[in-house]
Swiss-Prot record:
This is UPF0758 protein BCE33L4198. One of its GO terms (molecular function) is metallopeptidase activity. Keywords: Hydrolase, Metal-binding, Metalloprotease, Protease, Zinc. It comes from Bacillus cereus (strain ZK / E33L). GO terms for biological process: proteolysis.
Length: 225
């Protein structure tokens, strides 16, 4: 089996990582360090290349399932599990930066808080951030996964968590898998319904942010709130 030790010395990614730091490694080299070994037919770097090619780079690889990974020749359950665990740790580390009572002062703060987690999602996720009186995030909840419409996103589910957490206000977010954050008619209808319910029960819906690919739209800034 071809492992990292079998690669030509100047191409050994683990040794380069130790000498030059992880930031000096390419995507294929970092992947090789995680995989550790290749197969009888190919080196670990060639296996890395094959995986990256199969998923068209990191964008699709980050959401790869166990079944998709093991379908690649040379990747077994153990290697696939290592990769999936590494990707999940990466996502959690990104979130850690913002979990210490992150304060939201404007739509940009809100988009920055959720952008990296939501912009690559393959389905629409409707998420609520629950804030205290200082506009600090005290909880977040995924309310619904799927195409957004006013009959599915029920105010009861949104405000139930607000009462549980004694939240002072709410910010709603959802992503557009197309990457285009332009609001649809349904997006606007859902927003207006939630805002009206919030007014009645005394928990303000501050904004509804639509996440695209490194772009976002604030429905408050657009005048829909």
């Amino acid at each position: 089996m071809n492992g990292i030790r079998d690669v030509v010395k100047e191409e050994q990614p683990r040794e380069r990582l130790l000498l030059e730091g992880a930031g000096s490694l390419s995507n294929r080299e970092l992947l090789a360090v995680l995989l550790r070994t290749g197969s009888k037919e190919e080196s670990v770097l060639k296996l890395s290349d094959k995986i990256l090619h199969h998923f068209d780079g990191l964008r699709m690889l980050k959401d790869a399932t166990l079944e998709e990974l093991v379908s690649i020749h040379g990747v077994g359950v153990a290697k696939a599990s290592q990769l999936i665990a590494a990707f999940e740790l990466g996502r959690r580390m990104v979130r850690l930066e913002y979990q210490n009572r992150y304060s939201i002062r404007n739509p940009e703060d809100c988009a920055r808080y959720m952008m990296e987690e939501m912009r690559f999602l393959q389905q629409e996720h409707f998420v609520c951030l629950y804030l205290n009186t200082k506009n600090q995030v005290i909880h977040r909840q995924t309310i619904f996964i799927g195409s957004l419409n006013s009959s599915i996103v029920h105010p009861r589910e949104v405000f139930k968590e607000a009462f549980r957490r004694a939240a002072a206000s709410i910010i709603c977010l959802h992503n557009h898998p197309s990457g285009d954050p332009a609001p649809s008619r349904e997006d606007i209808e859902v927003t207006k319904r939630l805002v009206e319910c919030g007014r009645i029960i005394g928990i303000e819906v501050l904004d509804h942010i639509i996440i695209g690919d490194h772009k976002f739209v604030s429905l408050k800034e657009k005048g829909h709130i």
